[in-house]
From Swiss-Prot:
Isoform Mu17, isoform Mu18, isoform Mu19 and isoform Mu20 are expressed in skeletal muscle. Isoform Br21 is expressed in brain. Residues 1-827 are annotated as: 89 kDa domain. The 55 kDa regulatory domain is involved in regulating binding of SPTB/spectrin (beta chain) and SLC4A1/erythrocyte membrane protein band 3. The ANK repeat region forms a spiral around a large central cavity and is involved in binding of ion transporters. Adopts a T-shaped arrangement, in the ankyrin-1 complex, in which ANK 1-5 repeats are orthogonal to ANK 6-24 repeats, with the peptide binding groove of ANK 1-5 repeats oriented toward the membrane. The rearrangement of the ANK 1-5 repeats orients the canonical protein binding groove to directly face the membrane, to interact the membrane-embedded targets RHCE and AQP1. One of its GO terms (molecular function) is structural constituent of cytoskeleton. Residues 1234-1362 are annotated as: UPA domain. ANK repeats lie at residues 44-73, 77-106, 110-139, 143-172, 174-201, 205-234, 238-267, 271-300, 304-333, 337-366, 370-399, 403-432, 436-465, 469-498, 502-531, 535-564, 568-597, 601-630, 634-663, 667-696, 700-729, 733-762, 766-795. InterPro entries: Ankyrin_rpt (IPR002110), Ankyrin_rpt-contain_sf (IPR036770), Ankyrin_UPA (IPR040745), DEATH-like_dom_sf (IPR011029), Death_dom (IPR000488), Multifunctional_ANK_Repeat (IPR051165), ZU5_dom (IPR000906). The lineage of its organism: Eukaryota, Metazoa, Chordata, Craniata, Vertebrata. This is Ankyrin-1. The gene is ANK1.
Length: 1881
């Protein structure tokens, strides 16, 4: 009984532990409630908390802690629960235990801490948490090892890095090897290199450990890195090498070391700094001398042209300057800005350097590019001593810059009084003038330097000196508003009433700028208010114009005349009203401003307000007595103007103030006539409601209906007819409205008038009917309409000439401009706005000018009566010129004209493309000037706030994710980028985009795609249709064409309430779509009505959008391609493809025509000729057709085939008797069917070189503009242009020439090119004149395929061309354009390709073609080919007349520079990079494009926008003075304001070399294991439970896995190599990388592995690359001798031999450190590179017959001391014996190797290898065994590679039993026939 009770208790305890281990909380609590001891444990001392912690059961751990289990209970091995959780990596459990008070530094029996365990197992998060909660990483085990030691030994790079970095002040977070390099810690570095032999691991900023060592001057670690193969010339993206850094830091020994190890002395950074630049900039004389002695280029230039002597002068390093001069540095060397070292010294104020330079012969008067001398610069920077020195040594005090500035001008402008005094005392003239005749007093006045001005005046400076435009210093001061300066000048007798050439006094200028204090000061000195400008503007006019209310008040208080009339009779009130300055209007009216004052043409202010729709201003004027019926000289009232402009609110206001709506002008024009002229229906409605006469006539008898019919305003015609306008009213010439409409060609209006009772038989006074007029003028459509209804008997024969009839109009011009800007341009200082632009351009056209009146363009030779229209010119508001380029907008036409003929007049050429415009609540629209049809319409009350609307075009290749296109889809337009992106509008806006898609066979449709982010594209949907257009326009006067008109013009209209990032139009096959739900449904094709898809119930589980696409297959296309071999049904597609349905859906497809005509049901499956083809490929991939007839049952009914399918796909029926060919036929036909059709035009350019020879250039273009082509710049002439022709994407176009022109080509050669949409498709064709006595003309035909005489071709386009006259001097140009001599001289360009041309001829031809097609891109190509700015400028200067010349010169220069390295592939790559891949495609075919397409790394999205043109006038003096050395160029130079040597300034911020107390933890405190020992590894606790009948299988598996892993040998580099490698992205600044590396904030490093190919193959260190060199691998890594076929190995072997021999040579680094190095390091140095722990030798790459070399290397290796890792209890004697035995085994292996390998087999069969390896037995002891490895096979993996790799089959066995090894070999050979194996780790 006691036994059973005890058994039950033990079983309960075990069950409790099992529950804790499995996380069964309820069961565990039940056991505790039943009395189980919570602290019970298993046989190994593990209690419930231990077990739950190991398995990570957080809730169980928390509950046990709350139940007061003993937290610090230890197992038999001394482990606490925290130890176990840390070892298992259970970070949540670790957090709970630590938060509950667990001891983070508790040690187990052997001294293991939780941190040690976590570091051993690579649990980074646990390591971080423990460190943050007080874990001490310096607590060591009994063997003396720390967590860092075990992490290093295990190769856990992230843990190592964190442990090393933890505790640093700067949170630098560098790779571990970099930290070791920074601390000069050679031991840690050695271990890190043992785990990862790559010494050139990169930090985030791209620097290697050697860079760090060079920066901190750590010689020991630098030597180690170099010995281990670090690249001494490793160059990150910014170009900074270790030698740059060492030169900058000034460490002589480091520089010597790097130079001796092969550092390149001429290497340059990204900014082209050499090490000598760095040394000179920092004044390191000794290093500069060393570099110069080693041949450093003393004249090397940076990007900006700075040489080392410039650098030394900038840093005030006198000794460096002397040294450089001693080595013959050019004392007057110049930068790109022509700055000499003396300029630099003057800029920086370095008196001593300047004196040395002058003493050594520097020119004191050397001029920079903008003319500045050192004296100018010293005066500008206020360096008095340098200035005095320069003057003493011969500097000219009167030297002038390019703009005529003397040093006194500069000092006066900068306000340096001591300099000014000194210059005047030395004889400088106070009244000297620059090119704008400005004196120093002008300069001082402009900058507001009162003291300088006072001193100048005391020295007889002329106070009223006049500049070029007669402005005085007082004008300058008034403009800027320096009141004290104004008062000073006035006190010194400055005349306040002197005027400029345009008549402006200082008072005018101060009033314009709004400087009240200045105005007051001038008035107090009796400045006249009556002075007028040449336009008659008083100061009050100017204040009114610019809205300066306080100035206007002040002027009126000082008795300014409020009604002063200017040159055109304009009063200040006119001006204020015109500029909509309501506050000024309200100020003038109560103070006597008259609202009745007329201008010269009779316009009152109310006229202007009415015209500009200024309702509030108009109300104020009417309130103060303004007359609503005031008439101008021609009788125009404000109502006329408001009506004409369409301002309905203004019209209503005027009519409410007794305006007479029936009042006509002198010609009888009423407001309704003008409304009819412009088509404003809402205004007409207001007028009619106020009783205006509908049929009022003018003096010539025109009614409003006549006018509306004449101008094509169909909406207004309808409105007038609805209000009973007389449809047959006649003018005095007998013209009815129908006559007018017929005369102008308005077919729609003719039809409308006829429907409303217009008589077609009415004749004019000269007997002309409307039909006669239409026939005479050639209006075909109008004639067709009228001839049906016109009585033939009434037709009267008229004379050949038809006299045009035009309604009256008014031409009044009011010029409210004021010519005040011209002389003020020179006043521009910083922060001046665009009001300085010449304001004569500010003319406002109140209505369209004469040449803008809508007329028929088909009658150019018919004399026309002058149309009457109201033309009023007024000054427009200035913001337009500021916001956008005026040329980029086109005024909207009031009506879209319907014309049957094509205008022979080309559209006006506009230089800009619309970029942006401002829009507010009033709305607005803009049109593209370069892209006809592009329009953005923002209706009124759409924008909640003023918004800048932008529109740009984007190339698809510039997008990260272009729109996804299936093979039958294509972009029909450019991609439109609208802004602001994401803008939301209050109501819909309209975007119209021109497209170039053709409807093809009528089976295509246009779809609008939109993208919010540039990566996801979706179809644009809008709930607003065309019926909402009038509602959307919201009363806006903007004409929108019908859908038919848009389709005719190929314009797509988008209605949207927001702006995505991109819009684009796509052309695709028509689809019919619907939303299908679980209830089922069907889809029918509208294009092919018999096609139907039926969806049964539950085919889909939720409502989804499905589409059905049916593409007809034209029989003629099938016959053309396949003859009568097969016929096909329409192609039917269910979209989206590859969708699986829950129930089969039914499809119905019409049968092919041949099957329908002759059905044959005799067979099924493979025997029937009717084949069902299917392609399930989805997305943008190409269709792959397969025959599924055998697996799909077809049911025939009503000439259709029915079948079911579970998957949406493409389906196609084919009647093909040759069933095996059905798929091939379908593929061929489908390729033709999916080509996207476009509308393109052919344009031909021609040029004659001499009377018999010429050149043709043929374009097939979509939206490309002729004015941007190369031919425009090469003096070609356009000789022909086609109408729009339908062409297919990718179509081959063949040109055939006939007539008197003969193409210069071989007989069998035909000119052809491929069409690609939105690309420049160009064909160059040299021609000769057949018969010089006849006209040089002919016919050019474009065909679908090459011309054959026996077949008839369908000609796409046929153009007649006539060559232009012979261009003079073209022969010389022809000679220049031939780049053949250089191509012939360099054989590398002779690419031998099959064909009639030799390789040289082909290269020659390609170069010529590239030259011809480069055009304006040659400069971009030059930059891509790394040509300097000087080279590009030289090419421009030497070849000024022709782009072709410049292109040829560039390519010739490139060939000369590259020599034998010149390669067409490099040229093609450069062309692809600058987005000129079409040239490559033209030369090599389209296949190249896909192969060579690379991500563009430089270009941003290009659009066709032009930046606003720069303002005219002189450049700002402020700009010139603030950067005299750069001349407005952004290039860096030492003279930029406060810019301190851009290229290396960042390095100045790097702290000095670290002392012992660096930010890092003391490495002496972090013990790294001593030689011969390794850190002990922790094994997991045994969590098995005794008496347990059902162990948890997962726990058992885990235990087995862990113990199995630990029973293997210790993990070497194979299991976790320390790849401390990061992204090699580098800062763009030359030296930002290093400072970021050393001082950046904490950042996460990338875990990305560096590909082997990125390692530096040219490094000379052994152990770097195991594939190419004799590799020496440390640690536990097994080695074996391997031989490869690499051709480079012999060289590597020799280098390795040399390095082995150089270890004891005199020149090694040992000699540098014999006195300084510590004993341990000295010992390692003498042992050589093979001394690190158990190194084995792997020899590879020996050439055939190289046995002597192999022996030499092997012997040299064996001569060095070998060490190994002994067991802990081994004695020194044991180690010695083992070492001797190992050397014997190596010698034995060498002998065996030499005996076995003979002849050619030497390279392929390595011998046996004997190595010692260590294993851990079950008790945890280390056991050493000797292993023989024998290579039994070698397998060549890649015979194609230059450096072949081999994979070896290795069999291994213990040395004690070699017979077992032989058995293993035999066994292995039986099974290795088809498999390869690599050695197990």
């Amino acid at each position: 009984m006691p036994y059973s009770v005890g058994f039950r208790e033990a079983d309960a305890a075990t069950s409790f532990l099992r529950a804790a281990r499995s996380g069964n909380l309820d069961k565990a609590l039940d056991h505790l409630r039943n009395g189980v001891d919570i602290n019970t444990c298993n046989q190994n001392g593990l209690n419930g908390l231990h077990l739950a912690s190991k398995e990570g059961h957080v809730k169980m751990v928390v509950e046990l802690l709350h139940k007061e289990i003993i937290l610090e209970t230890t197992t038999k091995k001394g482990n606490t629960a925290l130890h176990i959780a840390a070892l298992a990596g259970q970070d949540e459990v670790v957090r709970e235990l630590v938060n509950y008070g667990a001891n983070v530094n508790a040690q187990s029996q052997k001294g293991f801490t939780p941190l040690y365990m976590a570091a051993q197992e690579n649990h980074l998060e646990v390591v971080k948490f423990l460190l943050e909660n007080g874990a001490n990483q310096n607590v060591a085990t009994e063997d003396g090892f720390t967590p860092l030691a075990v992490a290093l030994q295990q190769g856990h790079e992230n843990v190592v890095a964190h442990l090393i970095n933890y505790g640093t002040k700067g949170k630098v977070r560098l790779p571990a090897l970099h930290i070791a390099a920074r601390n000069d810690d050679t031991r840690t570095a050695a271990v890190l290199l043992q785990n990862d032999p790559n010494p050139d691991v990169l930090s985030k900023t791209g620097f290697t450990p050697l860079h760090i060592a060079a920066h901190y001057e750590n010689l020991n670690v630098a030597q180690l890195l170099l010995n281990r193969g670090a690249s001494v010339n490793f160059t990150p993206q910014n170009g900074i090498t270790p030698l740059h850094i060492a030169s900058r830091r000034g460490n002589v020994i480091m520089v010597r070391l790097l130079l001796d190890r092969g550092a390149q002395i001429e290497t340059k950074t990204k900014d082209e700094l050499t090490p000598l630049h760095c040394a000179a900039r920092n004044g390191h004389v000794r290093i500069s001398e060393i570099l110069l002695d080693h041949g450093a280029p003393i004249q090397a230039k940076t990007k900006n042209g700075l040489s080392p002597i410039h650098m030394a002068a900038q840093g005030d390093h006198l000794d460096c300057v002397r040294l450089l001069l001693q080595y013959d540095a050019e004392i007057d060397d110049i930068t790109l800005d022509h700055l000499t070292p003396l300029h630099v010294a003057a800029h920086c104020g370095h008196h001593r350097v300047a004196k040395v330079l002058l003493d050594k012969g520097a020119k004191p008067n050397s001029r920079a590019l903008n003319g500045f001398t050192p004296l100018h610069i010293a005066c500008k920077k206020n360096h008095v001593r340098v200035m005095e020195l320069l003057l003493k040594t011969g500097a000219s005090i009167d030297a002038v810059t390019e703009s005529g500035l003397t040093p006194l001008h500069v000092a006066s402008f900068m306000g340096h009084l001591p300099i000014v005094k000194n210059l005047l005392q030395r004889g400088a003239s106070p009244n000297v003038s620059n090119v704008k005749v400005e004196t120093p007093l002008h300069m001082a006045a402009r900058a507001g330097h009162t003291e300088v001005a006072k001193y100048l005046l005391q020295n007889k400076a002329k106070v009223n000196a006049k500049a070029k435009d007669d402005q005085t210093p007082l004008h300058c001061a008034a403009r800027i508003g320096h009141t004290n300066m104004v008062k000073l000048l006035l006190e010194n007798n400055a005349n306040p009433n002197l005027a400029t050439t345009a008549g402006h006094t200082p008072l005018h200028i101060a009033a314009r700028e709004g400087h009240v204090e200045t105005v007051l000061a001038l008035l107090e000195k009796e400045a006249s208010q009556a002075c007028m400008t040449k336009k008659g503007f008083t100061p009050l006019h100017v204040a009114a114009k610019y809205g300066k209310v306080r100035v206007a008040e002040l002027l009126l208080e000082r008795d300014a005349h409020p009604n002063a009339a200017g040159k055109n009779g304009l009063t200040p009130l006119h001006v204020a009203v015109h500029h909509n300055n309501l506050d000024i209007v309200k100020l003038l009216l109560p103070r006597g401003g008259s609202p009745h004052s007329p201008a010269w043409n009779g316009y009152t202010p109310l006229h202007i307000a009415a015209k500009q729709n200024q309702v509030e201003v108009a109300r104020s004027l009417l309130q103060y007595g303004g007359s609503a019926n005031a008439e101008s000289v021609q009788g125009v009232t404000p109502l006329h103007l408001a009506a004409q402009e369409g301002h309905a609110e203004m019209v209503a206001l005027l009519l409410s103030k007794q305006a007479n709506g029936n009042l006509g002008n002198k010609s009888g024009l009423t407001p309704l006539h003008l409304v009819a002229q412009e088509g404003h229906v809402p205004v007409a409605d207001v007028l009619i409601k106020h009783g205006v006469m509908v049929d009022a006539t003018t003096r010539m008898g025109y009614t409003p209906l006549h006018v509306a019919s004449h101008y094509g305003n169909i909406k207004l015609v309808k409105f007038l007819l609805q209000h009973q306008a007389d449809v047959n009213a006649k003018t005095k010439l007998g013209y009815s409205p129908l006559h007018q409409a017929a005369q102008q060609g308005h077919t729609d209006i003719v039809t409308l008038l006829l429907k409303n009772g217009a008589s077609p038989n009415e004749v004019s006074s000269d007997g002309t009917t409307p039909l006669a007029i239409a026939k005479r003028l050639g209006y075909i459509s109008v004639t067709d309409v009228l001839k049906v209804v016109t009585d033939e008997t009434s037709f009267v024969l008229v004379s050949d000439k038809h006299r045009m009839s035009f309604p009256e109009t008014v031409d009044e011009i009011l010029d409210v401009s004021e010519d005040e800007g011209e002389e003020l341009i020179s006043f521009k200082a910083e922060r001046r706005d665009s009001r300085d632009v010449d304001e004569e351009k500010e003319l406002l056209d109140f209505v369209p000018k004469l040449d803008q009146v809508v007329e028929s363009p088909a009658i150019p030779r018919i004399p026309c009566a002058m149309p009457e229209t109201v033309v009023i010119r007024s000054e427009e508001q200035e913001q337009a010129s500021k916001e956008y380029d005026e040329d980029s907008l086109i005024p909207s036409s009031p009506a879209t004209e319907t014309s049957d003929n094509i205008s022979p007049v080309a559209s006006p050429v506009h230089t800009g493309f619309l970029v942006s415009f401002m829009v507010d609540a009033r709305g607005g629209s803009m049109r593209g000037s370069r892209h006809n049809g592009l329009r953005v319409v923002i209706p009124p009350r759409t924008c909640a706030a003023p918004t800048r609307i932008t529109c740009r075009l984007v190339k698809p290749q510039k997008l990260s994710t272009p729109p996804p296109l299936a093979e039958e889809e294509g972009l029909a337009s450019r991609i439109i980028a609208l802004g602001p992106t994401g803008a939301q509008f209050l109501s819909p806006v309209i975007v119209e985009i021109p497209h170039f898609a053709s409807h093809g066979r009528g089976d295509r449709e246009l779809v609008v795609l939109r993208s919010e982010n540039g990566s996801v594209w979706k179809e644009h949907r809008s709930r607003y249709g065309e019926s909402y257009l009038d509602q959307i326009l919201n009363g806006m006067d903007e004409e929108l064409g019908s859908l038919e008109e848009l389709e005719k013009k190929r314009v797509c209209r988008i209605i949207t309430t927001d702006f995505p990032l991109y819009f684009v139009i796509m052309s695709r096959l028509c689809q019919d779509y619907d939303t299908i739900g679980p209830e089922g449904g069907s889809l029918k094709s509208k294009l092919v009505p018999l096609v139907q898809a039926t969806f049964p119930e539950n085919a889909v589980t939720k409502r989804v959008k499905l589409a059905l696409q049916a593409q007809p297959v034209p029989d003629e296309l099938v016959t053309k391609l396949l003859g009568n071999q097969a016929t096909f049904s329409p192609i039917v597609t269910v979209e989206p493809r590859r969708r699986k349905f829950h129930r089969p859906i039914g499809l119905r497809i019409p049968l092919p025509p041949s099957w329908t005509d002759n059905p044959r049901d005799s067979g099924e499956g493979d025997t029937t000729s009717l084949r069902l083809l299917c392609s399930v490929i989805g997305g943008t991939d190409q269709a792959q057709w397969e025959d599924i007839t055998g697996t799909t049952k077809l049911v025939y009914a009503n000439e259709c085939a029915n079948f079911t399918t579970n998957v949406s796909a493409r389906f196609w029926l084919s009647d093909c008797p040759r069933t095996a060919e059905a798929v091939n036929f379908a593929t061929l036909l489908y390729k033709e069917l999916t080509a996207v059709p476009y509308m393109a035009k052919f344009v031909i350019f021609a040029k004659m070189n001499d009377p018999r020879e010429g050149r043709l250039r043929c374009y097939c273009m979509t939206d490309d503009k002729v004015d941007k082509t190369l031919e425009q710049h090469e003096n070609f002439v356009e000789v022909a242009r086609s109408r729009d022709i339908e062409v297919l994407e990718g179509m081959s176009l063949f040109a055939e020439l006939s007539g008197n022109l003969v193409p210069v080509k071989k007989a069998a050669q035909q000119r052809s090119f491929h069409f690609q949409s939105f690309r420049e498709n160009r064909l160059a064709m040299p021609v000769k004149v057949r018969d010089s006595s006849r006209e040089p003309g002919g016919s050019l035909s474009f065909l679908r395929k090459a011309m054959k005489y026996e077949d008839t071709q369908h000609i796409l386009c046929h153009l007649n061309i006539t060559m232009p006259p012979c261009a003079k001097g073209s022969g010389a140009e022809d000679r220049r354009r031939t780049p053949t001599p250089l191509a012939l001289r360099y054989s590398i360009l002779s690419e031998s390709t099959p064909g009639s041309l030799s390789g040289t001829e082909q290269a020659e031809m390609k170069m010529a073609v590239i030259s011809e097609h480069l055009g304006l891109s040659w400069a971009e190509l030059a930059r891509e080919l790394q040509f300097s700015v000087e080279d590009i400028n030289r090419i421009r200067v030497e070849n000024p007349n022709s782009l072709l010349e410049q292109s040829v010169a560039l390519l010739n220069l490139w060939v000369i520079r590259e020599g034998q390295n010149a390669n067409m592939e490099n040229l093609y790559t450069a062309l692809q990079s600058i987005d000129r891949g079409e040239i490559v495609n033209m030369l090599e075919g389209s296949g190249r494009q896909s192969r060579n397409l690379k991500p563009d790394r430089r270009h941003t999205d290009r659009d066709y926008s032009l930046s606003p043109s720069q303002m005219n006038g002189y450049s700002s003096l402020q700009d010139e003075l603030l950067s005299p050395a750069s001349l407005g160029c952004a290039l860096s130079s030492p003279l930029r304001a406060d810019q301190y040597w851009n290229e290396v300034a960042v390095l100045d911020a790097i702290p000095l070399a670290a002392t012992e107390h660096d930010t890092m933890l003391e490495m002496s405190d972090m013990q790294v294991w001593s030689a011969g020992l390794t850190p002990s590894l922790v094994t997991a606790e045994d969590s098995s439970l005794e008496c347990s009948k059902a162990e948890d299988s997962d726990a058992t598996g885990h235990e087995w896995k862990l113990e199995g892993a630990l029973s293997e040998e210790p993990r070497g580099p194979e299991l976790g190599s320390l790849e401390l490698v990061e992204d090699d992205t580098v800062d763009s600044d030359a030296t930002n990388g290093l400072i970021d590396l050393l001082e950046q904030e904490e950042g996460q490093r990338s875990e990305e592995k560096l590909p082997g190919s990125k390692r530096q193959d040219d490094a000379t260190g052994a152990g770097q690359d195991s594939e190419n060199e004799v590799s020496l691998v440390s640690g536990h890594q097994r080695g074996q001798a391997r031989i490869t076929h690499s051709p480079t190995v012999s060289q590597v072997t020799e280098r390795s031999q040399d390095r082995l021999q150089d270890w004891d040579a005199d020149g090694s680094i040992v000699s540098y450190l014999q006195d300084a190095a510590q004993g341990s390091w000295q010992e390692e140095v003498t042992q050589g590179p093979h001394s690190f722990q158990g190194t084995s030798t792997m020899t590879e790459g020996l050439e055939p017959g190289g046995s002597q070399e192999y022996e030499k290397v092997l012997v040299s290796v064996s001569e060095h001391t070998w060490t190994e890792q002994p067991e802990a209890e081994s004695s020194q004697a044991d180690r010695d014996r083992r070492q001797q035995g190992q050397e014997e085994q190596v010698q034995e292996a060498k002998n065996t190797f030499t005996q076995v390998v003979q002849g050619n087999e030497f390279q392929n069969i390595p011998g046996e290898q004997v190595t010692e390896e260590q294993f851990t037995d079950e008790q945890g002891n280390i056991v050493t065994k000797k292993i023989i490895r024998k290579v039994v096979r070698q397998i060549d993996l890649s015979s194609a590679d230059a450096a072949q790799e081999h994979e070896e089959v290795t069999v291994e066995g213990p040395l004690e039993d070699p017979s077992e090894l032989e058995v293993d070999i035999d066994y292995f050979m039986k099974h290795s026939k088809d498999h390869t194996s690599t050695p197990n780790p």
